[in-house]
Amino acid sequence: MRIAILHNRDHQLLDDDPGREAREDVERVAVALRDALSSSRREVELWPVAEDVFEVGRKLQTSRPDVVVNLCESLAADSRGELVVPALLELLGLPYTGTSSLGLTLSLHKNKAKELLRARGVSTPEFCVLSTVAELVSVKMPFPLIVKPSREDASVGIDFDSVVHDKASLGKAVGRVLRTFHQPALVERFIEGREIYVPLLGNQPRRALPLTEIQFGAAFENKPNVISYAAKWEPTSAECVDSPSGPCVLSPELEARCIETAMAAFEALDCRDYGRVDMRLAPDGQCYVIDINPNCDLHPHSGFAKAASSAGINYPDLALHLVELALEREHGNQAHRKEGPAAARRVAGSHRNLLAARAGMRARANRSRARGD
């Protein structure tokens, strides 16, 4: 079996990239997955993606690996490019791990994601989107509020100053997002309470791995309990040291409610294979979805990998399971477990290649015009 691991390599493109550490981490994950998947029966290759996605497409069209592990989270240091590689893989008819281009698009644009969640009856904090500082007068929600970039992941753009308690600090936080990230600011009601993560694995059936909770320590005394960029990506910072994740202890009823809410959110945004749903649990027991992370961090020391380990799934088995999910979606059966025949059947089925199908349609149309039909 030939496996291609695609990952973005764009962390050096911008001198002032505010998400540099998150983009750098993807390469480490790619190497870890390559090592976990490599065996005498599997050939695994790393394919970095920088800016020229068309060259990647040509290489994929020529090489046609049996399955692609998609780790691309941006393109040319722009998070909106996250959808480009899966869309390309869909056009080429290549099976790949993780959420589709549609699901990634819906999840990335946080305001659209929240609109869909609300339409499905999934609890999420009240919110609004501001494209200019002048729109501050339209904000009617009660404080405290939290201000985030509207289309970033991995806590990019979040720090203690993101949680605001008055109009003046709200204006500063919104202005900072607009200037730094060149995108609208998402303003939502800040939910005081516990921060809980629900990791999800699989499709039919989908299962919840053991829930985890952030333990906010001394660095958060008299500060908002919020996972900032520093807490997530700067391991020597006090915010990171004092916000470890650990087992989440809930009553059976409350745990079931959190899992049900997470499952509904994942389904609403067309997510698949694996991911994590982040929640705030209010003192009254109401759980609110604050973020959905399809294709979440797969580093061996990530929260997702640790949750899988707690469920009895070691890292190599987790990596192989994600590959199997992609192949099952492509072939609809377990033939791929033989690590060979399924791939031959896929390559022979050229009708799966949408580019080839479109080329055939164009050729037929040209012949029809030549005949004067």
Q: Where is each model-derived feature located?
A:
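Active-site nucleotide/adenylate-binding loops and adjacent lid/helix of ATP-dependent enzymes
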Residues: M1-H7, Q61-R64, L104-R194, Q204-P205, ...
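ATP-binding N-terminal substructure of ATP-dependent carboxylate-amine bond-forming enzymes
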Residues: M1-T97, S101-L102, L106-L108, S131-V137, ...
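Short, acidic Gly/Pro/Ser/Thr-rich loop/turn segments
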Residues: D10-L13, E152-A154, P205-A208, F216-A219, ...
